[in-house]
């Protein structure tokens, strides 16, 4: 029944609406509004790269693209496939699209066993982590794009209005609160980056987090159940010190911060005071563009927004990139007239790690 629930059917004339790139194939009915040839070629290369990194043989893998009328895109992974919905008239930029799709590819291999709050940080965090670091290592992603994605993730993590939630609390809100939903992803990503740095330091660069991940993939494919305690044991066998305090600090409570060399010595880190994006309305407004949960005397209320209004605002990653003193411009239509309401980012702030390329390094 689980396999049946994960099965996706696409019906229609697909004879001319697909491309194959090695074991990976891409299928669509409505033209998706992107260059499918270059998209499929890059995704096929990424599939081969991940298959090799995780020590798992390549096998047929299908990507289904479908149209929807909404902003942005969403995707879900299934056995040997994933489905992505996008708006052909408003497609994502190439970088955001590739990052989303590379994330979904990782789900084909990397899993832990256990309850949701014990494994989601690994499943989603490893997908965020490897969708960035593997293309960077392979030269498929330049340092500027890599750092832009990492620094947005850091802001989503450490300036998140829900940052005080434990991972168990965040998991309970996983499908109802957009901001809480992001915490397992980004905390897991920065934990794995920090762990990779600790492994490299303690083993004179001989062991990476990749080596532990390959062991998990191998042993789970042989039928072994590996949960959070099994993961910690594998780390401890290499580092010879308790791992749970690190996991608690960076994932369970989120109180800790990754080390400066989490992504390698070619980057340096600084702590930056950035805005906490809490505008005084329900977080779903950032996704739907429909104002809900307006807080009396909150920033949006003071700026003149009304509950249940439809608004147009930048995509959330663009909002997260904003700095203290910037102004968020929101377009709203009232009675056939269009107006712009501005919310200055002068509220709460948080110190967040941000990375940049280190000058004069040979690493």
Language model features with spans:
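Soluble non-cytosolic domains of exported or imported proteins
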Residues: 33-45, 91-96, 100, 117-121, ...
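Propeptide (latency) domains of metzincin metalloproteases
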Residues: 1-17
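Surface-exposed patches in mature extracellular/periplasmic domains of secreted proteins
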Residues: 56-64, 115-119, 138-147, 205-212, ...
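Pan-zinc metallopeptidase signature
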Residues: 165-253
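Beta/coil-rich, acidic/histidine-enriched accessory regions frequently appended to metallopeptidases
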Residues: 219-363
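Long, well-ordered core segments of solenoidal/helical folds
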Residues: 105-106, 110, 150-162, 212-222, ...
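Juxtacatalytic substrate-recognition/specificity segment
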Residues: 15-119
């Amino acid at each position: 029944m689980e396999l049946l629930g994960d099965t996706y059917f696409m019906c229609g004339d697909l004879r001319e609406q697909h491309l194959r790139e090695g074991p990976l194939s891409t299928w669509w009915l409505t033209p998706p509004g992107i260059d499918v040839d270059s998209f499929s070629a890059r995704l096929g290369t990424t599939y081969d790269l991940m298959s090799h990194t995780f020590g798992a043989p390549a096998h047929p893998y299908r990507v289904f693209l479908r149209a929807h009328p909404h902003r942005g895109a969403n995707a879900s992974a299934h056995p040997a496939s994933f489905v992505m919905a996008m708006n052909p008239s408003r497609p994502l930029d190439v970088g955001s699209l590739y990052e989303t799709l590379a994330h979904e590819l990782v789900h084909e291999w990397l899993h832990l066993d256990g309850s949701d709050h014990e494994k989601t940080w690994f499943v989603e965090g490893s997908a965020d982590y490897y969708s960035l670091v593997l293309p960077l290592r392979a030269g498929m992603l330049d340092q500027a794009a890599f750092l832009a994605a990492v620094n947005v993730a850091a802001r989503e993590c450490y300036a998140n209005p829900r940052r005080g939630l434990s991972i168990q609390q965040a998991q309970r809100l996983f499908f109802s609160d957009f901001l809480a939903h992001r915490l397992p992803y980004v905390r897991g990503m920065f934990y794995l980056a920090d762990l990779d740095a600790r492994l490299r330091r303690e083993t004179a660069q001989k062991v990476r987090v990749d080596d532990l991940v390959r062991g998990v993939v191998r042993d789970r494919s042989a039928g072994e159940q590996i949960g959070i305690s099994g993961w910690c044991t594998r780390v401890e066998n290499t580092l010879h010190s308790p791992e749970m305090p690190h996991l608690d600090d960076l994932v369970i409570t989120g109180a800790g911060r990754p080390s400066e060399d989490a992504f390698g010595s070619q980057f340096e880190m600084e702590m930056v005071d950035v805005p906490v994006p809490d505008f005084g309305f329900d977080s779903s407004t950032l996704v739907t563009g429909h104002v809900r949960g307006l807080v009396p005397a909150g920033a949006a209320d003071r700026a003149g927004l009304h509950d249940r209004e439809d608004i147009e605002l930048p995509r959330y990653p663009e909002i997260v990139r904003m700095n203290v003193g910037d102004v968020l411009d929101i377009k709203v239509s009232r009675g056939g007239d269009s107006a712009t309401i501005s919310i200055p980012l002068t509220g709460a702030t948080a110190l967040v790690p941000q990375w940049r390329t280190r000058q004069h390094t040979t690493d």
